[in-house]
């Protein structure tokens, strides 16, 4: 997920300005016209919500590798660019595909998260 500002809504479609940096560090450049995407409105900061804040600013793109089951949950391995390794902290939060996850394991150019059934 990433943070965009909607600049227009018309006939059931939304528009947003997307700069070259956003195209470079996200997968937005791979989208086709009329391809459905998930949109979430910003929430008010003074209300109750589940979870915690995750900013929609993107530092880079990882690639999903191995997915393996562990009971009802799933381990997901993600390959990350070496340039991002220093920002990944074990037991820290990391947003992947718009989901805020806890980094369970860190290895060179790789991290693992566990996703519970509710989130999967």
Placement of each model-derived feature along the sequence:
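Conserved loop->alpha-helix
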Residues: 1-120
């Amino acid at each position: 997920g990433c943070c965009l500002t909607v600049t227009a809504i018309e006939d059931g479609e939304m528009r947003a300005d997307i700069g070259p940096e956003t195209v470079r560090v996200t997968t937005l450049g791979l989208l086709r016209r009329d391809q459905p995407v998930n949109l979430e409105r910003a929430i008010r900061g003074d209300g109750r919500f589940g979870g915690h804040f995750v900013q929609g600013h993107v530092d880079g793109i990882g690639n999903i590798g191995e997915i393996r089951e562990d009971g009802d949950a799933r381990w997901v391995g993600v390959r990350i660019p070496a340039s991002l390794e220093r920002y990944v902290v074990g037991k820290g939060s990391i947003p992947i595909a718009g989901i805020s996850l806890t980094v369970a394991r860190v290895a060179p150019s790789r991290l693992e998260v566990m996703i519970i059934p509710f989130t999967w």
